[in-house]
Amino acid sequence: MINPRVFFDIDVDGNRIGRIVIELFADQVPKTAENFRALCTGEKGIGKVSNMPLHYKGSIFHRIIKGFMCQGGDFTHRTGKGGESIYGANFPDESFSRKHDTHGLLSMANRGPNTQTSQFFITTRPTPHLDGKHVVFGRVVSGYNVVEMMENEPVDDQDRPLHNVMIANCGELVLKLPPGALLKKASAVSDESEDEIKNRKRSRSSDDDSSSDEDSEEEERKRTKKKRSRKHSKKDKKKKKRESSNRKRSPEANRHVSRERRDISREKRDNSRERRLSRKEDDRRSPSDKRKEDRRSLSPEKRSSERRVARPVRPRLNYNDPNVEVKGRGRFKYRPTY
């Protein structure tokens, strides 16, 4: 748990002397710490008892004893006789587990047991005689030099400062991590995870080769089982869809569908039989018969084209031409070559 932090901006007679940053022990005294935090922010509005803003802003340190403490928080009377908590007039003591064993501690002021309001004090030395009587709820984490300056302010015979030592501004500080802090944390976590993974891999690699082979075989078996299960699941889904569609249909529609399926199956059977018979007849025929049938099936145009392609065209010879010579009985006709 991260404890909240608040701040006081201190002015002496209107002159800013610095800022005090305070950590509240919300993990040990949450009720007391919440009272102080809310009075620093002023978020609770007007008090039910005093009808005044529940806010430390503008209040003064009305009592300062050098070598002991600086007391403030009376925003109702500004004399040490007033004050109001966010819970009402006062609230009980929460815990005395923290001791007044050092300087810079924040403790609740009271008029006896269970009379805490809004008044508090900051110690400037260890004060063990206050243990068990006042609740310690915070500590100064920065700006203790400002507390020392307040401690050295002149006071009258009633320990009231001669100058106006006022809380000019106060509030809660929001924890903001630096830009690279989150990345560093994430990288640290990732590095740890990578180290763990590497250690696991090393431990696995240190095992026998036989165990690794067995593992690989088992993995392959699992994969094959998964593939088979997927195939079966697809088939089951299709069957379920068919069954669901059949259930949704009326009995007459189911009969009609079954008839159509029977007709389709009969047509398929007849087609298959015809194909088989035609194949058998083709096997019985000679190749010349097949060629003749193929030629018959062709159109006359295709036949003429086949003939033209098969026989090259030759120019006719003019027998009246004196250059044409006939050899033999007249079958071999040729033109003389020069």
UniProtKB/Swiss-Prot annotation:
Keyword Isomerase in annotation: yes
Biased composition (Basic residues): 223-242, 329-338
One Pfam short name: Pro_isomerase
A GO MF label: peptidyl-prolyl cis-trans isomerase activity
Stretches for region Disordered: 186-338
InterPro entries: Cyclophilin-like_dom_sf (IPR029000), Cyclophilin-type_PPIase_CS (IPR020892), Cyclophilin-type_PPIase_dom (IPR002130)
Disulfide bonds: none
Keyword Isomerase: yes
Residue ranges with Basic and acidic residues bias: 243-309
Sequence ranges assigned to domain PPIase cyclophilin-type in this UniProt record: 7-172
PROSITE patterns registered for this protein in UniProt: CSA_PPIASE_1, CSA_PPIASE_2
EC number: 5.2.1.8
Domain of life of the native organism: Eukaryota
Catalytic activity: [protein]-peptidylproline (omega=180) = [protein]-peptidylproline (omega=0)
Gene3D superfamilies per record: Cyclophilin-like
Keywords: Isomerase, Rotamase
UniProt GO cellular component terms: cytoplasm
Ranges annotated as biased composition (Acidic residues): 208-218
GO biological process: protein folding
PANTHER family: PEPTIDYL-PROLYL CIS-TRANS ISOMERASE (PTHR11071), PEPTIDYL-PROLYL CIS-TRANS ISOMERASE D-RELATED (PTHR11071:SF561)
Family: Belongs to the cyclophilin-type PPIase family.
Protein name: Peptidyl-prolyl cis-trans isomerase cyp11
Taxonomic source organism: Rhizopus delemar (strain RA 99-880 / ATCC MYA-4621 / FGSC 9543 / NRRL 43880)
Gene name of the encoded protein: cyp11
